[in-house]
């Protein structure tokens, strides 16, 4: 039994760490590193021109054909960009390029880039010199202005700056362009407290000819690293594209997949998205039409995922509209679920999602009462421990009985010496006589590992944990303990637990078991502090429970002997 238990513990330790590394392989970013820019002493503003693009909007624009299953890239010549149009709400701070009307800059005022600089918001979109990430949209096809050989349309706006005023619930920003008797309005509608904005094209055809075009919307990103990633050494979250299909509500498309060639799907409704740590950006088309979804690389090597809608036809003297929604913000499951089916799955809890989702649901409800994620994790641990109390109690009783028969095991070892077969047979007979389950001590470990891994992914993926403080030196539960105090405490609790367990009769096994607290402490040094907190509390409760059961059985044994 002892060798089996030792092997199991070592194997689970290895599986845990390999599982984390496997997560890194499957979900981790395969991006090229970029130079990190230190935060300035003043909160930076959005620049007035789209730097890095030389003031141009020379992106690869998809062309629409009669068959919407194909959308080949079309090179458009560079057009000098005018000053950007700035828009600010209570949750968004963005800039729109008049050339094409793309959202080229976007910051999240409620999410600081660094915890020690709350005045510097996290920047989601950037079309500057360091990296490229923006949301593009336009009208292509037969008469679409974005398909012109002369370049994308240059829109005008009544103002250069828009801000949602106090008491104002919504705000509309309109961009206008006219050509060949056709008037175009590109309208952005913002609402207080929302990270999604509605983009509407109004085509007013005052020409003598019918107008036909296709709406396209896409997300363009280079291969730079994830600026929102705060994970530890050996771990990472998924950085890449994803889309919805009827057969697969959450289909990831990595940069490597896009490198292999274009991916094309005909999808009714759905969404296309770009995922990174804690945040997601998604274009959501009209759910009532079938759109051509595709991924590709443009001429500059940027990765693109987007869709092209069916042809919109507008007769002379008539108006036509087409709409899409852009979401750019945190991975809030409740909000994403309301926006579009399957979008909440971008909060990726891995293969143990069926355990992780209930854990997060319970954790949220506890936090609603306590208001602190650290204390919420402690209460959650106590509830989980209470749930498995009967199973743990049976296991600890088995280990207590084994500790009581340890002297008898020593006698058997002296009797049978190096004859392992006879020793094993004698041990099993003794266990049967004493009514001991030789594998009983392994059950708590087996039960805890899925919960442990699920909580790890909850802490890693849930934006609610980002920069969430507990007490004293733990100012962010989503990253490692800066002073490694919790991992050391965790190692100490493991050592105390070992003292309560029966010593393996094999000296080699005993040495391996003594090394386990050191090995686990090393693993936990870089784990999120919230996860280590869970393990510390769990171990502490286990020690109390095991000590109580051991004393109780010891007292009963002495009473029976008397």
From Swiss-Prot:
* GO BP annotation list: protein insertion into membrane; protein transport
Is the Metal-binding keyword given for this protein?
A: no
Q: Does the record bear Transport in its keywords?
A: yes
- Any GO MF annotation of the entry: membrane insertase activity
The record, for Pfam families, names:
60KD_IMP (PF02096), YidC_periplas (PF14849)
Please explain the role this protein plays, according to its UniProt record.
Required for the insertion and/or proper folding and/or complex formation of integral membrane proteins into the membrane. Involved in integration of membrane proteins that insert both dependently and independently of the Sec translocase complex, as well as at least some lipoproteins. Aids folding of multispanning membrane proteins.
Q: How does it assemble?
A: Interacts with the Sec translocase complex via SecD. Specifically interacts with transmembrane segments of nascent integral membrane proteins during membrane integration.
- State the family it belongs to: Belongs to the OXA1/ALB3/YidC family. Type 1 subfamily.
The record, for PANTHER family, names:
CYTOCHROME C OXIDASE ASSEMBLY PROTEIN COX18, MITOCHONDRIAL, OXA1
The protein depicted here goes by the name: Membrane protein insertase YidC
Q: Which organism is it from?
A: Pseudomonas syringae pv. tomato (strain ATCC BAA-871 / DC3000)
Q: Which gene encodes it?
A: yidC
């Amino acid at each position: 039994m002892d060798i089996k238990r030792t092997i199991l513990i070592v194997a689970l330790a290895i599986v845990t760490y390999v599982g984390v590394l496997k997560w890194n392989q499957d979900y981790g970013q395969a991006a090229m590193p970029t130079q990190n820019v230190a935060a300035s002493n003043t909160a930076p503003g959005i620049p007035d021109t789209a730097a890095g693009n030389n003031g141009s909007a020379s992106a690869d624009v998809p062309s629409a054909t009669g068959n919407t299953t194909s959308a080949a890239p079309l090179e458009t010549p560079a057009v000098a960009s005018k000053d950007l149009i700035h828009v600010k709400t209570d949750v968004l701070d963005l800039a729109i390029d008049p050339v094409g009307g793309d959202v080229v800059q976007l910051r999240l005022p409620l999410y600081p880039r660094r915890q020690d600089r709350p005045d510097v918001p996290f920047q989601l979109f950037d079309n500057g010199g360091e990296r490229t990430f923006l949301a593009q949209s336009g009208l292509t096809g037969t008469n679409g202005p974005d398909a012109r050989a002369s370049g994308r349309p240059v829109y005008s706006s009544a103002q250069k700056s828009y801000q949602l005023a106090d008491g104002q619930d919504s705000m509309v920003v309109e961009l206008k362009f006219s050509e060949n008797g056709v008037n175009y309005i590109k309208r952005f509608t913002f609402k207080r407290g929302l990270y999604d904005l509605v983009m509407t094209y109004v085509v007013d055809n005052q020409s003598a000819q019918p107008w036909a075009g296709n709406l396209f919307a896409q997300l363009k990103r280079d291969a730079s690293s994830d600026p929102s990633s705060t994970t530890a050494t050996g771990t990472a979250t998924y950085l890449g594209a994803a889309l919805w299909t009827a057969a697969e509500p959450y289909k990831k498309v990595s940069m490597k997949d896009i490198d292999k060639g274009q991916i094309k799907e005909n999808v009714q409704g759905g969404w296309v998205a770009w995922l990174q740590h804690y945040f997601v950006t998604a274009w959501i088309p009209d759910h009532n039409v079938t759109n051509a979804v595709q991924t590709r690389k443009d001429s500059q090597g940027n990765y693109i995922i987007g869709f092209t809608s069916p042809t919109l036809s507008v007769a002379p003297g008539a108006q036509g509209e087409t709409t899409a929604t852009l979401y750019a913000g945190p991975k809030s499951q409740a909000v994403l679920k309301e926006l579009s089916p399957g979008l909440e799955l971008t909060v990726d809890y891995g293969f143990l999602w069926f355990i992780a989702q209930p854990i997060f649901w319970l954790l949220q409800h506890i936090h609603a009462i306590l208001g602190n994620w650290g204390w919420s994790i402690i209460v959650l641990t106590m509830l989980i421990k209470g749930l498995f109390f009967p199973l743990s109690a049976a296991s600890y009783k088995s280990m207590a009985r084994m500790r009581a028969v340890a002297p008898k095991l020593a006698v058997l070892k002296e009797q049978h010496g190096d004859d392992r077969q006879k020793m094993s047979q004698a041990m099993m007979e003794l266990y049967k006589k004493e009514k001991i389950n030789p594998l009983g001590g392994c059950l708590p470990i087996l039960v805890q590992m899925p919960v442990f891994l699920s909580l790890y992914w909850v802490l890693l993926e849930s934006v609610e944990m980002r920069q969430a403080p507990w007490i004293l030196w733990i100012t962010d539960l989503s990253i490692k303990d800066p002073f490694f105090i919790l991992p050391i405490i965790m190692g100490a609790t493991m050592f105390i637990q070992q003292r309560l367990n029966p010593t393996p009769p094999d000296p080699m096994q005993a040495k391996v078991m003594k090394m386990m607290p050191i090995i686990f402490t090393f693993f936990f040094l870089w784990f999120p502090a919230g996860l280590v907190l869970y393990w510390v509390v769990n171990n502490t409760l286990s020690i109390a429970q095991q000590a109580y059961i051991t004393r109780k059985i010891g007292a009963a044994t002495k009473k029976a002997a008397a």
